[in-house]
Amino acid sequence: MVSDRSCIGYLRSVIAGSVDTHTGHECTITNHAAEEGGGTAAAAAVKVMTVSGSGKRGRYVRQVTGRHNDTDLHVAARGGDAGALRRALDEAAAAVATGEGREALEEVRRAVAAEPNEAGETPLVAAAERGHLEVVRELLRHLDAEGVAAKNRSGYDALHVAAREGRHAVVQEMLLHNRLLAKTFGPANTSPLISAATRGHTEVVKLLLELDDFGLVEMAKDNGKNSLHFAARQGHVEIVKALLEKDPQLARRNDKKGQTALHMAVKGTNCDVLRALVDADPAIVMLPDKNGNTALHVATRKKRAEIVAVLLRLPDTHVNALTRDHKTAYDIAEALPLCEESSEIKDILSQHGALRSRELNQPRDELRKTVTEIKKDVHTQLEQTRKTNKNVHGIAKELRKLHREGINNATNSVTVVAVLFATVAFAAIFTVPGGNANNGVAVVVQAASFRIFFIFNAIALFTSLAVVVVQITVVRGETKSERKVVEVINKLMWLASVCTTISFIASCYIVLGRHFQWAALLVSLIGGITMAGVLGTMTYYVVKSKRMRKIRKKEKMSRRSGSSSWYDNTELSETELNQVYAL
C-alpha cells in the first residue's frame, strides 16, 4: 500500500519524454486512477498530456480533484487567482514543450486552458460564472475561437453563463474580444439576452441590446417566447422598458401558444410591467391566445385581483369578452375555488358590468359595440380635422407674417437706396463737370451734354426725394396696400436709376470732350446695355407675375361657380409650378 505523501508526490511529478520526429503537434489526454486500498490520496485522479513535435516529447502530470475532476486551472479560475492560473499555464508549457519554440509553448497553453473537466466545464466557464474578470482576461489571451465558445454539458458557453449570472464586466470583456459570442445559443435555443432578461440583470440586457446589427431582441426559444416574455413574467420592469424602447412592436409578438408578453405579465404580480406594456401598445390588452384567452381571462384564472382591477380601468378592455369555450371572465371567476382572492375578483368584475356568458344578449352587444366603434371613428376623424385646420391656420399665419416682414424689408431697402440717390444727385449739381466760372456759372453751360446732365440729374433728385417722402409718410399695417405702394415706389426708383445713368453718361461727354470721344461712347454702350437688360428682364417678370395672378383669380371664380374646365386646371398647375414674383 502506497502512503498518502508518496502518492501525492507521484501526482506532481514531471516525466521527461524521448525524441520524436513527427511534424506538427498532437495533443493526447489520458485519465489514470491511482487507487491503493483505502487511503485518501488513493482516490485522486491524474491527467497526463503528451505533445509531440519536432523537438522533445513531454508528459505533464497534474493533480485533479473534486467531484468533476477539476484541474488546477479550474481551481484557480473559481478562486479568481490570476497569478496561480498564469503559473499553472507556464508550468504545463515548460513541462510538455521542453526545448521547443515560443509557438509550441503557446499551443500547449491553449490546449491546457481549453481542457474541460468531467462536467464539460472549461476554466473560462468557471471564471465567467463567478465574475473573475482578471482570470477571464488571462484565459482569453491564450484561447482560440473554439476554446472561447466551448460549452459545458448543459449547453452553455462562457458568455452565456456570465450573462445568466449577471457578470456585466465579464460580458463586456468577452464581447470586446468577439462580438459574435452574443449570437450563441444554449439549450432550447436560449440566447444570452433571454437568460439575462429572465434573471433580471438590467445592465447586462442593456449591454447586449447595444448590438443592433445582430437582432438579439427578435430571437426566441423553441417555444416561441422571447426575452420580453420572460422579463414580463418575472416582473422585471426596467428590462421590459428597455426592450420596448428597442422595439415597441415586440409587445405584439406571441409564442407558440399565441401568448403575448402581456399574457405573461398578468400571471405575475407587478402592475408596473403591465402599464409599461400597455403604454407601448394599448391594443394588446384584447389580443387573444390560441384558446381565445385575453389578458383579463388569464389574470382572473391566476387570481390576480390587483391586475384585474388595473386591466378593467383600461379603455380598450372588454369585460365580457368570450374565450373559445364561450366563457367570460366572470364565468372563470365563479369556477375558482372559494377564497378571498376569487371573491374580490368577482366583486371587481361586477362593478365593471361583467356578466355570465348565458346572460349576454349577443345581437344587442354587437350592435352596441358597432355603434361605439362608429362614434369613436367619427370622433377621431373630427379631432383629426380640427387639428389639421389648426395647423393650416398656423401655417397661413406664419406665411402672412413672413410676407409682411418681406415687404417691410423691401421698403426699408428702397428708402436707403432712395436717400443714396438723392444725396448723389444733390452733390452732383455743386460739382459740375468742367468747373464754374468766377461768377458761379458752369463753364460748359452752353453744351448740349450739360443740359442733358442737368435735367436728368434733377429728375433723379426729385424722384428719390418723392420716394423718401412716401416711405416716411405711409402707415404700416395693411399688407395689400403696402404691396401697391411698394410697386409704385419701385417704378419711381427705376426712373431714378435710369436718370442717374443718363446723367453719368452725359458727364462723361463733358469731361472727356472731343479728344476721347471713344471712351465716352464705350461708357454709353456699357451703361445702355446694362440698364436695358436689367429693366427689360424685370419688366418681363412683372408682366408674367400679373398674368399669373389673373389666371389664379379666374380659376378661383370658376371653382366657385362650378364651371372649371380641365384646360384651366392644367394651365393653373403649370403656372403654380413656375411662380416668379416681382414687385
UniProtKB/Swiss-Prot annotation:
Record's subcellular location: Cell membrane
Keyword Transmembrane: yes
GO terms for cellular component: plasma membrane
InterPro entries from the UniProt entry: Ankyrin_rpt, Ankyrin_rpt-contain_sf, PGG_dom
Record key words, sorted: ANK repeat, Cell membrane, Membrane, Repeat, Stress response, Transmembrane, Transmembrane helix
Residue ranges crossing the lipid bilayer per the database entry: 414-434, 452-472, 492-512, 518-538
Domain of life: Eukaryota
Principal cellular location given in the protein's record: membrane
Pfam family, one: PGG
Membrane topology: Multi-pass membrane protein
KW Transferase (keyword) present: no
ANK-type repeats, residues: 68-97, 119-148, 154-183, 188-218, 223-252, 257-286, 291-321
Role according to the record: Involved in salt stress tolerance.
Name assigned to this protein: Ankyrin repeat-containing protein NPR4
